[in-house]
Amino acid sequence: MAKILISALLCVAMFGSMALGSPECPTPNGRFASGDQCDSYTECQDGTPVEKLCPDGLLFHQRTKATGECTYAPYSTCKERARLQPANGTEECPRQFGFYPNGDATKCGVYRNCAHGVASLTKCPEGLAFNEETYQCDWPDLVESCNAEAYLGFNCPAADSADDSAAAAVDVSPEGELRYYRHPQTCKKYFVCVNGHPRLYNCGKYLAFNSQTKLCDFYNKVPECYALLKEKQRLKAEKQQPQVAQPED
């Protein structure tokens, strides 16, 4: 009877240990974020833990309780796991992998996509800037390393400007005061000044910015733009007309 009781207690202890796991291996098999380092993880096989590092510049992302992978991700996702392996950068890249600003505050719509220490340049959609904090293309005024005015080539007029050309429709949003200005070189684009900083918007094909409605509208609803469009069409038609040969004397 005593032997049976001891065997039962041993079984309970063994299976209880397997169910609870260890700090290194919460389950016998899987990959788990480790310690305070954002680019390392523990790989467990049958309960045996092995510490591993992601390639330089990639961070470990815990997808489920037992699965994870090294992936491109901004450092801001590390939170309390703030430590990283020493950087192994090149002339082109701060680390072997990752997305990085190009270092020019006036051309912040282009960023470096680094793989194995080699950078390829990637462009954000027009008017947006690369945000290293989120690994996304964002409004230039929200990107610390970007000079929104120099990048977009537009300075928001002062709110109390007396210049008629600076007159703008005004809205108020949770972000602050919004002022709308047509692009000085084309009717198809316009700027929204948010707290004094510009953001570029683009109307769709066959549309122009209507400063009265603060929306993109048909050209014939925007008289000043419609006149420019008709003149442009006239000049284009003239260029396409065949040249008439002049008779020789």
Curated annotation (Swiss-Prot):
Organism ancestry: Eukaryota, Metazoa, Ecdysozoa, Arthropoda, Hexapoda
Key words, A-Z: Chitin-binding, Cuticle, Disulfide bond, Extracellular matrix, Glycoprotein, Repeat, Secreted, Signal
Domain Chitin-binding type-2: 22-80, 90-148, 170-227
Name of the featured protein: Protein obstructor-E
Glycosylation sites: N88
Species whose genome carries this gene: Drosophila melanogaster
Cysteine pairings via disulfide bonds: C54-C70, C124-C137, C203-C216
Record has Signal as a keyword: yes
Signal peptide: 1-21
Molecular function per GO: chitin binding; structural constituent of chitin-based larval cuticle; structural constituent of pupal chitin-based cuticle
Subcellular location(s) of the protein: Secreted, Extracellular space, Extracellular matrix
InterPro entries per record: Chitin-bd_dom, Chitin-bd_dom_sf, Chitin_bind-dev_reg
GO biological process: chitin-based cuticle development
